């Protein structure tokens, strides 16, 4: 009693029942074939319909395959697909629904870079605030503190920086700021 039976995470965006899929849809699939097929698909020019079908398949809530595939590789397949098509709104939605996935730092960096590059600083900072995550990535840590300052939450920014400093993070810019 109280035992966790399945330690694999459910990752995705769409309800499997709405798309005719199942949470365990990857269980009987050979992991190596998933990776090879995704590599092949990523190099193809797909019609909009094919792209939408593959997106639904990849982003439907499911467990990763049981046998032999590293969960990071499986998540990487999803991240690479999202980045390839640069749909910022879809990526943001995926990030918000899968906050606890470490591999999402790559997606978070991608979205932030895209938003900052078009001068959407407020939108980038609001996303970081909504994710409200401690990052292992120094780049994301820096921007999460910067965004608190940008959003005029200096006290929170100072507190966040102090907490990060205790974990070994150091940034000369913030040392001067606080």
Residue ranges of each PLM-predicted region?
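Residue-level signature for tetratricopeptide repeat
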Residues: 81, 110-115, 147-148
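Solenoid-repeat scaffolds in large eukaryotic assemblies
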Residues: 88-91, 121-125, 154-160
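N-terminal alpha-helical interaction modules that lie
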Residues: 1-75
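Long, His/Glu/Asp-enriched segments that create or flank divalent metal/ion-associated functional microenvironments
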Residues: 10-11, 164-178
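Structural motif corresponding to the intra-repeat A-B loop/turn of tetratricopeptide repeats
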Residues: 85, 118-119, 151-152
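Solenoid-like repeat scaffolds
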Residues: 20-29, 43, 58-68, 93-103, ...
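Generic helix N-cap/helix-start motif at coil->alpha-helix transitions
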Residues: 68-75, 100-110, 134-143, 156, ...
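Alpha-helical segment of the N-proximal tetratricopeptide repeat
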Residues: 73-87
């Amino acid at each position: 009693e109280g035992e966790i039976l399945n330690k694999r995470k459910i990752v995705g965006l769409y309800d499997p029942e709405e798309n005719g899929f199942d949470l365990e849809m990857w269980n009987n699939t050979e992991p190596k074939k998933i990776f090879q097929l995704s590599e092949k698909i990523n190099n193809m020019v797909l019609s909009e319909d094919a792209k939408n079908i593959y997106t639904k398949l990849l982003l439907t809530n499911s467990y990763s395959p049981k046998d032999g595939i590293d969960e990071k590789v499986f998540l990487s397949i999803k991240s690479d697909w999202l980045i390839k098509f640069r749909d910022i709104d879809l990526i943001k939605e995926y990030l918000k629904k899968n906050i606890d996935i470490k591999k999402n730092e790559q997606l978070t960096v991608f979205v932030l870079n895209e938003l900052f590059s078009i001068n959407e600083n407020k939108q980038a900072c609001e996303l970081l605030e909504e994710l409200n995550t401690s990052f292992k990535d120094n780049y994301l840590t820096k921007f999460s503190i910067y965004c608190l300052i940008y959003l005029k939450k200096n006290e929170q920014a100072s507190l966040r920086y102090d907490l990060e400093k205790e974990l070994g993070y150091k940034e000369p810019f913030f040392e001067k700021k606080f």
